[in-house]
Amino acid sequence: MARLKPNQDLTESVEALCRQHGMKTAIVRGAIGSLIDAHLQYATPNGPREMEINGPGVEILNVFGEIGFSDGQGNPHPLQGVVADTDGKIFAGRFVRGANLSFITIEITLQEWVAVKQQEAVPA
């Protein structure tokens, strides 16, 4: 469990937390809080598009995804989620890196994913 302070980017902060605690792979189990504005990406037949949900005070309803670093490279998995604007209208998509700043705070729950070798697995 971690708390992001005001003006910290959601994606970049979660990645930094994982690095700080030596997590090579982690799963976001949930988050609550608010964003100044939300910037989400979504798929269309003509390719990805972005939308901006204006705040301040865009509420986070759910965040999910996997954080993983392979061979020292960046995280190829964007976080996804659901947010509500100040009128209660709901939006979903991938959070755009560097564009989703915490308004007051965001509390987020991460679980480290530790790979188990086949011979170490416990039979069912």
Language model features with spans:
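N-terminal intrinsically disordered, cationic/polar leader segments
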Residues: 1-30, 36-124
